[in-house]
C-alpha cells in the first residue's frame, strides 16, 4: 500500500491516531468565505399550500425563522462539532427560494477574517435552516425530505473550491 502524502492525511488525528484539534496558530490571517446549500423537498400538495400561503405556516414565517435558526447555528458551530475553532463571524447571509415546484433551496454564505475556513459554519447554517423548515412544516406532512446538503464554494486558505459567491 503506498504511503499517504501529508496533504492526504486526516488532520484531526495525531501521529498516534488520537483525535486532536488542528493547531492553526502558524497560519496567516486571511479573508475566508464559504457557501453551502441544503434542500427541502415537499410533497406536491404541501408545496402548493406553502406557495399559496407565502411560505407561512401555523408557526409563523418559515423563511424568517429558518434564517434566524441558521444564523444562530453558524455562530455556535464550534459547540456542536468538537474540533471546529470558535471563529469571529463577520457575515452570515441566507438565500432561500424555490428550486422547482417542490424543492426549497437554502444557501448559507459565511465570511470571516481568520486563520481557518468557515466551511463547517456554512454547512451547519444551511443544515439547521433546513431542519427548521421541516419543523415549521411538519404539521402539514412528515413526508418531506432534506438533502442533499453540500459545500458549494470556499475561498481563502490553501485552495479555493467552486465558483465565487
Curated annotation (Swiss-Prot):
It catalyses: (8S)-3',8-cyclo-7,8-dihydroguanosine 5'-triphosphate = cyclic pyranopterin phosphate + diphosphate. It is an enzyme of class 4 (lyase). The keyword Lyase applies. Substrate binds at residues 83-85, 120-121. Keywords: Lyase, Molybdenum cofactor biosynthesis. GO terms for molecular function: cyclic pyranopterin monophosphate synthase activity. Its EC number is 4.6.1.17. The active site is at 135. Pfam families: MoaC. CDD domains: MoaC_PE. One of its GO terms (biological process) is Mo-molybdopterin cofactor biosynthetic process. Pathway: Cofactor biosynthesis; molybdopterin biosynthesis. InterPro entries: MoaC (IPR023045), MoaC_bact/euk (IPR047594), MoaC_sf (IPR036522), Mopterin_CF_biosynth-C_dom (IPR002820). Homohexamer; trimer of dimers. Belongs to the MoaC family. Catalyzes the conversion of (8S)-3',8-cyclo-7,8-dihydroguanosine 5'-triphosphate to cyclic pyranopterin monophosphate (cPMP). This is Cyclic pyranopterin monophosphate synthase. The gene is moaC.
